[in-house]
Amino acid sequence: MIFVKIFKKVKYSAILMHGEAVDEYEKLSGVRPKLSYLDKKPVLDVGYVSASHSGEYSVIAYSDKEVGVDVEKIRNVSFARYFMGEIGKPYSTERDFFREWTYRESRYKAYGISVNRATGRDIGLHPDFLLGYDLCVVGEGEILFSWSE
């Protein structure tokens, strides 16, 4: 199972977000996990954590398996100039560009590998409830969302 908590109007550095992840996990489970880093990737002694922030939102994902999360504010970019690595195709809208970007970022956070080295063990879930943003969660299992103002 993957638990995803979304915070509005909270801006953290990655290190502070990882500390917040420890606090949130303790609130959920009653157990205070120990946070460590493996190849610069945050790992809890009880599972995995991933964090991201953009614009007005911060997101933390927890799982007993590898997990990756990314949120990006959809903004005007010169996306016609951007090519996504080996895919080598321009995108027709900013939404398409950021959907691909967040999937690649989430996948890298979860497994440390690019989307082009597909394993078939995950999907990228893009819920549409954050207007003006793209959020992607990559991992295995059911995904539960929680919201905090």
Task: For the regions a language model picked out, list residue spans one by one.
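Core catalytic alpha/beta fold that binds nucleotide/phospho-ligands
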Residues: 1-149
